[in-house]
Every structure is written in C-alpha cells, then in structure tokens.
Swiss-Prot record:
GO terms for biological process: chemotaxis; defense response to virus; innate immune response in mucosa. Its main location: other. It comes from Saimiri sciureus. Pfam families: RnaseA. This is Non-secretory ribonuclease. Its EC number is 4.6.1.18. Gene3D superfamilies: Ribonuclease A-like domain (3.10.130.10). The gene is RNASE2. Substrate binds at K65, N66, Q67, N68, T69. Keywords: Endonuclease, Glycoprotein, Hydrolase, Lyase, Lysosome, Nitration, Nuclease, Signal. It catalyses: an [RNA] containing cytidine + H2O = an [RNA]-3'-cytidine-3'-phosphate + a 5'-hydroxy-ribonucleotide-3'-[RNA]; an [RNA] containing uridine + H2O = an [RNA]-3'-uridine-3'-phosphate + a 5'-hydroxy-ribonucleotide-3'-[RNA]. Interacts with and forms a tight 1:1 complex with RNH1. Dimerization of two such complexes may occur.
Length: 158
C-alpha cells in the first residue's frame, strides 16, 4: 500500500510541478481586496467539479483561467499559516512574505482541458492532500479587522 501511495504522490507532483500554481497576483477585480480575491480563487470547503467551481473566477476575469488550485480548508486556517516563519517565495525569489503550511490539506487542482471559450470553460480535476505556501500581507481596509495579516497569493503546492 505504501509504495502505491508514494508512487501516486510522485506522479501528482510530476503533473503539478511543471504547471505550477497560477496565482492570485494576476490582475484582480477592483471591487475586491487581495485577501478577498484569494478567498474567492482558492478557498472552497468541499470539493466541487472544477468546471462548475471555476465559473465564479472566470466570470470576474472574463476569460478561462488556465489552472487553479482550491484548498479545502477555512480562510481562518490559512490566516494561521501567515503566522508561520517567513520564507522566500518559491515561485518569486524577490518576495519574502511567504509561509509554509505545517499540515497537508485536501485540495483540488483544476486544469483547463477544452478550448478557452468563456461561455464554456471545461476543466479536469485532480484531488490530492498537499502542503501549500502562501504570501501574506497586512490587511486592506476592506478586510475584516479580525485578521491583521491575511493571505494574498497561493504561491505553490508541495
């Protein structure tokens, strides 16, 4: 059982590794803070089919986003990761506001499979349990004062 699970995880890393994580530091809709946009793009408590789940993101971006990762955890749990030790962001060495999760979380990786027509974006789904790295910043005035530091970018999954 262990070799099969290990092999599956290696295959998933090989699949996801070169693709990276298309992060939330791309243009965001003006009406949202970076933390709000992070939540819309990456927090989803229960797994949904990617084609359905991506509709909200694509509606705001007015395009079919190539790939996206949904963490099946709470915003509060990701905020807690912001309290972990600062590190250089793996995907952007000029940023030093990243934080590595201490526990793996269930996630869904969505990959655009069909032609990118905004009226019909079709995605494949890959489920996994993985660690993640997020960039965090001080909250925007539009964010809840409950959290002084908030996640703003999903840098990578490991």
């Amino acid at each position: 059982m262990v070799p099969k699970l290990f092999t599956s995880q290696i295959c998933l890393l090989l699949l996801l590794g070169p693709l990276g994580v298309e992060g939330s530091l791309h243009a965001k809709p003006r009406q949202f803070s970076w933390a709000q946009w992070f939540s819309i793009q990456h927090i989803q408590m229960a797994p949904l089919r990617c084609t359905y789940a991506m509709r909200a993101i694509n509606k705001y971006e007015r395009r079919c986003k190539n790939q996206n990762t949904f963490l099946h955890t709470t915003f509060a749990d990701v905020v807690n990761v912001c309290g972990n030790t600062n590190m250089t962001c793996p995907r952007n060495a000029s940023l030093h506001n990243c934080h590595h999760s201490r526990v793996q979380v269930p996630l869904t990786y969505c990959n655009l499979t069909g032609p990118p027509t905004i009226s019909n974006c079709v995605y494949s789904s890959t489920q996994a349990n993985m660690f993640y790295v997020v960039a965090c910043d001080n909250r925007d005035p539009r964010d809840s004062p409950q959290y002084p530091v908030v996640p703003v970018h999903l840098d990578t999954i490991i």
